[in-house]
Amino acid sequence: MKILLYIAIILSFFSLITISSECKIAVLLSGSPNDLGYNYLMNEARVKAESELKLDFSIYYENLEESMEEAEKAFQDALHKGANLIVVGSFVHVGLGLKYAALTKDQDIYWIIRGNKRPNPDLPHVVILNFNSFELHYLLGYFSGLMTKTGIVGFVAPGPDVNTISTDNSFYLGAKYARPNITFLNVYVQSWYNPNVSYSAAKMLIKNGADLIGMSQDDMSCQKAMMDSGLIGIGATGYPTHLLFGGNVGVSYITNWTNLYVKYAQHVLNDDWPDYSSYFTNLSREDSIFIDDYSYKVPIDIQNLVNDEIQRLKNTSYIPYRSDPYLAQLGIPFDSKGLLVEDQFRANKKLLKGDSISKVIDFGQYSIPIEFIDYPNSLKYGVTIVSGVCIFICLVCMTLVVVFKKARVIKSSSPAFLLLILLGCCIIFAACILFAQSPTNQTCSARIWLLSLGYTLFLGNLLVKNWRIWLLFDNPKLKKRAITNWKLYPWVFAILAIDVMILAIWQGLGNINAESRIGYDSLTQYQYKNVCSSDDQGSIALYLLLVFHGLVLLVACFISFKIKVVDIEEFNESKPITTSVYIITFCLFIVIPLMVSPQSLTSQTTIICVCAIVTTLISMLLLFGSKFYKMATQGLAINETFATSTKSSSKSSKSSYGKDNPNPNAINFGEDDTSDETSEEKHKSPKQKSVNFSNKSNSHLAVFTSDEETSKTSKLSIDFENSSKDISIDQLQQQKQQPINTNGDLENKSNDKIDDDNDNSSVLSKRISNQQNGETEIDSNNV
């Protein structure tokens, strides 16, 4: 008894040693484990085996079909990490699997390799995995022949360079058996796993009338094309596709490799590997291959017919895909059982031809045509229409400025500069139209030129026009300053010249052109877009251009701030200008981060166009809308002087003569000056006259000097001194002299400062009005 006890203990000890052997699984996949197809199921079996056997280590490698070099690295890495059960799941890597299996044949490393037959010379640690895919494709072809409404079915296969054509022939024979007059469409995609090509190939078959499509791909791309076209799909990847697509999949075959993994992992753990083993499975074994439930869209009578065919296929003597006499055209001999010789059948590279009833159309190798992807029509048409409307508005505004150039609100804002500003707006809108079109070598340069020049004209003229107002009103000593339009044009041209110079550098050094880029902007590898590109020197010049426009914006902001104190409405455009500049700056703070962050080309173009149109249109409405509104509501006011703000008016009312005015014929500063220069005045010789007003206050002298286009000078001196002679307004008008507003008698010294302020306001009002139109300069040194 003791001897038996010792023997039992020893056996238990060795049993524990055997069970404690490690099993590290490595799975090499041809595609993605997320394809919901063959690769997914191979990896799912690894996960389930790891969980069931409580393994400490397992690993997988994906997308190895793309590069044999990467596949070889995966083999080496798996061996380096100590994997001792390596699964090679694809026919593509059979050669590499057998190579490394031969190199490690003397080690405790075991292999499961998918293939058709055992290697020669044979390797004891290799299990050959295969399943009867021919009967499955035959069954799905039979189902398709029963379900088709058009009488046309299709098949997508890797092709003769990758796989046997017997899968294609099996599907065709199944469909022909169900419907003898079937039309069969066949196409090759040169890969087990290329979703883009497979999807496009299936779409091509659908366009040619196929309403059911079989495949020998590792993913559901073909069936997705079917369902996207409103047709019913069939599951040919081994995944229970009804879990994902529901009733849109008519029927699927299911493969479950967990039993395979667990079986051979236990052999590794128990150290009892079955040498020279093979794992061939089919419907009859019911261990790894099953048929899924039918969709509710499949009629019951068709379900019954398919079930009957399944039962016949489970009889191993029923092999219609190898025994049909129609197969004789392949040139493969039949064996004694009336079947095509298996090895030659599996290696067949020839597609069956049609007969007098059925028809076979071979599309051969399929390649996706390279497709040009343009901007969406919504962007192209939307930007073009909106920009066109904005250009029309600009032209209308330009017409109004020209027609009503002598109106008070237009004349005070310098019509010439207003026209240049509107011209800049038109150019900006034209640039937006070019931005919305597909780039070409010409438009890549033209749109940048137009956009830059447009903003330079727009902001540059605003800057210069308001710089003059700042210089004239920022004049505490009331010195004589003559700044006509012709003195400002060189500044505008200087700003424009700087812009043109930078653009010329960008154009000359940047090598600006349009490139066709495949796979750009989240496109597939079979789609391309035209993209504007430049060299590094061009990028530097473009950044310099952005800095230049940024400086123009800053200067415009500064000048707008400086003229905000001007209390004469017609001259003080600081509010609309500042608002316009702020809007542009705000958009830049939005545009720049969006442009730097990853964005599609369409999104970038949309952002640029929308911001350019919105900022320019709002700025234009702010600058011109108020002017035209005043013209419409208050009249053209061509013969009226300039209205001041509330603050200015209140000062004028305090300093003017009221009920206590001893001289009813005196003219008051602060009141509207209704006079205007006429063409007759411009041709009269200058004269100087003294006009005496009786006033008890101290004497004052104001001298107005007119700078006409003829460069002649006329002076009007008004000498306020003690005199009993009064001159009325009518007498002044008869002499065709501009009426001069005075503050009359000052009742006390406390009002002197207010009088001087109003004198200055009126003098400056008249001066800026005339000088902006190149007509008059005012010398007020003696006020």
Swiss-Prot record:
Glycans are attached at N181, N196, N256, N282, N315, N441. Residues 763-783 have a biased composition (Polar residues). In the N-terminal section; belongs to the BMP lipoprotein family. Residues 21-383, 437-443, 511-538, 597-604 are extracellular. May act during the development and be a negative regulator. Disruption phenotype: Cells show precocious development. Alterations are also noted at the slug stage and in spore formation. Slugs are longer and break apart several times on their way to culmination forming smaller but proportionate fruiting bodies. Spores from fruiting bodies are malformed and less viable, although the spore differentiation factors are synthesized and sensed normally. Mutant completes development 6 hours earlier. Keywords: Cell membrane, Coiled coil, Endoplasmic reticulum, G-protein coupled receptor, Glycoprotein, Golgi apparatus, Membrane, Nucleus, Receptor, Signal, Transducer, Transmembrane, Transmembrane helix. The keyword Heme does not apply. The keyword Signal applies. Residues 405-415, 465-489, 560-575, 626-783 are cytoplasmic. It is a multi-pass membrane protein. Residues 1-20 form the signal peptide. It comes from the Eukaryota. Residues 647-656 have a biased composition (Low complexity). GO terms for molecular function: G protein-coupled receptor activity. This is Metabotropic glutamate receptor-like protein J. CDD domains: 7tmC_GABA-B-like. Residues 670-679 have a biased composition (Acidic residues). One of its GO terms (biological process) is response to N-phenylthiourea. Residues 56-85 form a coiled coil. It is found in: Cell membrane; Membrane; Endoplasmic reticulum membrane; Golgi apparatus membrane. It holds the Pfam family 7tm_3. The gene is grlJ.
